[in-house]
Amino acid sequence: MALTAGIVGLPNVGKSTLFNAITQAGAESANYPFCTIDPNVGIVEVPDDRLQKLTELVNPKKTVPTAFEFTDIAGIVKGASKGEGLGNKFLSHIRQVDAICHVVRAFSDDNITHVSGKVDPIDDIETINLELILADMETVEKRITRVSKLAKQKDKDAVFEFEILSKLKEAFESEKPARSVEFTEEQQKLVKQLHLLTSKPILYVANVSEDEVADPSGNENVAKIREYAAGENAEVIVVCAKIESEIAELEGEEKQMFLEELGIQESGLDQLIKASYSLLGLATYFTAGEQEVRAWTFKKGMKAPECAGIIHSDFERGFIRAETVAYEDLLAGGGMAGAKEAGKVRLEGKEYVVQDGDVIHFRFNV
């Protein structure tokens, strides 16, 4: 599933440094034919300890983790919604992503100038958010012009849409994003069709200095970002982009030792990948055989045939059953034979909603 998070941020906040760390740590693109091969797209493996344990259990010839795409979105400055900087290009790029990772500067460094002359994370956040709101306002106003005539004539669909558009316009006038507006399930379907930038889920990435990454509790800027994000019900990940680019060059034990020296349990990049994955409502199921153990990304709530289709359209078209076992039960049984003996392997049909951590063998006939 080619879902993408777009990385945005003002100049000199550490966005490019973080994105370069992502591309350095990049996954082998040959394993992921769906991924865009583009210099502004970084493909990363989704860290998952379960895959390693399955590999040890099954001992396959090949192990393939699931991957996630980050897009580096350049060109945002004050006035981007009016085409300033790389404004129009920026807006078209951000429309294509599924979620937004907003990198915010939370470090002080006199050698790195800030675009507005001072480090003010809330001002930075609001500058970008306002550009997105202004772009969405333009979309909504154009739509209102089109719909209002029909709404006045009491056209049922037009009245329904006009009500939604008016609600959105009111939010934008108060400088609030579309995701902050409550809609019914039916209304939400229409909002989705508008492809609004501010309806995309968001997480904030606070970029701190090297000496604060292990314990950012004394950083006032991080506290401000957390407080702002809490008002949006958004998550905050604390990273040091400079350190991440160093970590990206290390592997295995060397990487672990470096993290321990810094007093960090998990790299900021791994936290960012997991948080982005979760933000989009994604989960992982596994296929495990002698040839290959592989992790597959699916959207929570998907049924077995749809998940089978992620592997190949024939699997969905000719779906018969999904032989399924929970990852924990497979491990506890010491393998498929033990899990079957314990009665933990199930044959699931077309209506089965796949769960995170399911290990599945699909039966199909085309």
Swiss-Prot record:
Task of the protein:
ATPase that binds to both the 70S ribosome and the 50S ribosomal subunit in a nucleotide-independent manner.
One GO cellular component this record assigns the protein to is: cytoplasm
UniProt cross-references to InterPro entries, sorted A to Z: ATPase_YchF/OLA1 (IPR004396), Beta-grasp_dom_sf (IPR012675), G_OBG (IPR031167), GTP-bd (IPR006073), P-loop_NTPase (IPR027417), TGS (IPR004095), TGS-like (IPR012676), TGS-like_dom_sf (IPR023192)
Please report the stretch or stretches of sequence annotated as the TGS domain.
281-364
Q: Extract the CDD domains matched here.
A: TGS_YchF_OLA1, YchF
Q: PROSITE patterns per the record?
A: G_OBG (PS51710), TGS (PS51880)
Pfam families recorded? MMR_HSR1, YchF-GTPase_C
Fetch the Gene3D superfamilies from UniProt. 3.10.20.30, P-loop containing nucleotide triphosphate hydrolases, TGS-like domain
- Keyword annotations: ATP-binding, Magnesium, Metal-binding, Nucleotide-binding
The effect of disrupting this gene, in the record's words, is:
No visible phenotype.
Q: Which residues bind ATP?
A: N12, V13, G14, K15, S16, T17
Cofactors named for this entry: Mg(2+)
Report the induction information.
Weakly expressed during exponential growth in rich medium, stops at onset of stationary phase. In minimal medium is more strongly expressed and continues into stationary phase, part of the ychF-rpsF-ssbA-rpsR operon.
Give the protein name, as stated in the record.
Ribosome-binding ATPase YchF
Where does the OBG-type G domain lie?
A: 3-259
Write out the residues that bind Mg(2+): S16, T36
Please name the PANTHER family in this protein's record: OBG GTPASE FAMILY, OBG-TYPE G DOMAIN-CONTAINING PROTEIN
Q: Which GO terms describe its molecular function?
A: ATP binding; ATP hydrolysis activity; GTP binding; metal ion binding; ribosomal large subunit binding
Family assignment from sequence similarity: Belongs to the TRAFAC class OBG-HflX-like GTPase superfamily. OBG GTPase family. YchF/OLA1 subfamily.
